[in-house]
Amino acid sequence: MSKILVGTSGFGYDDWRGVFYPEKLKKGEMLRYYASRFSTVEINTTFYGIPAPKTFVKMAETTPPWFDFAVKANKELTHNPEVDPGVFASFTEALKPLLEAGKLACVLAQYPWSFRKNEENVGRLRQLRERFGDLPVVVELRNAEWVGEETFDLLKDCRLAFCCVDEPRFKGLMPRVAIVTAPPGYVRFHGRNAKKWWQHEESWERYDYLYTPEELSEWIPRVGEISAAAEKTYLFFNNHYKGQAAQNAVMFADMLGLPTESKETFISEQGQGSLFGMND
């Protein structure tokens, strides 16, 4: 069985104050606090803009030696048929500090639902591997057309890891499958807010969801299958609104019997107790 690491998709959310972070914690102290509770994080801000390398230098220095980062590829690399070589060069240059520090878990390439299964897009996936060389790359395919042995064989051939997901069960969305096509094992929990998935005014509404223990228990055997086939397995919660991702990450780690900080990580608005009712 592989090493299983649980974390969240992003960490710098202001609405986590008073739930996960202390109310008055400064923005610049959030990563250090987060890294005292979790051993991995998924960086999503890189999807929208490419940071200067010094940003990751600071992140690497702020976190413990065992902490690592999954970094989402910039959208220009996944959402445009023609990739600008300059954008790719800037993105890989930004990653160098994490690579040199031994803290880059993988690159997450998230494709849109409109990325359909066809010959052209199969070629784009092959080009993705060629561009990233030997770097570990996880691919999140959001259209259910891709589910099947043909795709899994393609990803294995390209040494691209398949991103398993948990999300609402709508036609055309990815089903809940457990598969490893290349290292690492990888699962993203987006929440099951079916009401707001397609119809929402703000993007965060889609991810306003708190998993129940019963819902997470469905993934225990799946995580077992994934971890049996990969040396490392990453489980990231993307239901970030109001700290629900962090709450579920601790909850699921506890259910899996993984070492975590205590449930006291979660504080009430009064600064006492926890959302898990430790003082009840």
Model-derived features with residue positions:
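Residues lining hydrophobic/aromatic ligand-binding pockets adjacent to catalytic sites
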Residues: 1-280
